Amino acid sequence: MMRRVEDLLKDKIPYGILSNTHGLNGDLKLYLFSNMPELVEKITEAVAYNESQKKFVIVKFSKVRKASDYFIVHLTGIDTISEAEKLKGFIIYLDKSFFPKSKDGEYYFFEILNAEVYDNAGEFIGIVEDIIETGNNDVIVVKKEKEEVLIPVIERYILKIDKEAKKIIVNMPEWLE
């Protein structure tokens, strides 16, 4: 089963989580991981996966409406609160192709996560393990063996991001040399 789940989630991006029920008619609250709420109304079908239960289901969105900081969604065939309860905690995954193509100089986190990072002399530094949003600029967390290096994503330090090759060339910050 694990192999099948991995295959199912290949090329999929976590978009949000079904956190709780809303009302008695099977509606659910969807909190987004993404800063692209405009995509919610375009979703027709998605994969919902709950890692702790090791369960997945293909869901069809029939109604969506905005609430305060979340969306209320109705999924086809989920018409009671007891049916909706079973989907609490499921993460909604969308195909990468569902997202608009990123522009030059911009990137989605999934495009640079696990990218190889090299300095401008071609020396391997590590793999992008995480991305921290600071408000001013992102910071990539690069892991090499047991060491972590934090590199601000600004022109001074990031020389090139090759999203296709999953490769980033950096000018190492002075404090790390």
Curated annotation (Swiss-Prot):
Residues 104-176 form the PRC barrel domain. GO terms for biological process: ribosomal small subunit biogenesis; rRNA processing. The lineage of its organism: Bacteria, Thermotogati, Thermotogota, Thermotogae, Thermotogales. Keywords: Chaperone, Cytoplasm, Ribosome biogenesis, rRNA processing. InterPro entries: PRC_barrel-like_sf (IPR011033), PRC_RimM (IPR056792), RimM (IPR011961), RimM_N (IPR002676), RimM_N_sf (IPR036976), Transl_B-barrel_sf (IPR009000). It holds the Pfam family PRC_RimM. GO terms for cellular component: cytoplasm; ribosome. An accessory protein needed during the final step in the assembly of 30S ribosomal subunit, possibly for assembly of the head region. Essential for efficient processing of 16S rRNA. May be needed both before and after RbfA during the maturation of 16S rRNA. It has affinity for free ribosomal 30S subunits but not for 70S ribosomes. Binds ribosomal protein uS19. Coiled coil: none annotated. It comes from Fervidobacterium nodosum (strain ATCC 35602 / DSM 5306 / Rt17-B1). This is Ribosome maturation factor RimM. The PRC barrel domain binds ribosomal protein uS19. It is found in: Cytoplasm. GO terms for molecular function: ribosome binding. Its main location: cytoplasm. Gene3D superfamilies: PRC-barrel domain (2.30.30.240), RimM (2.40.30.60). Belongs to the RimM family.
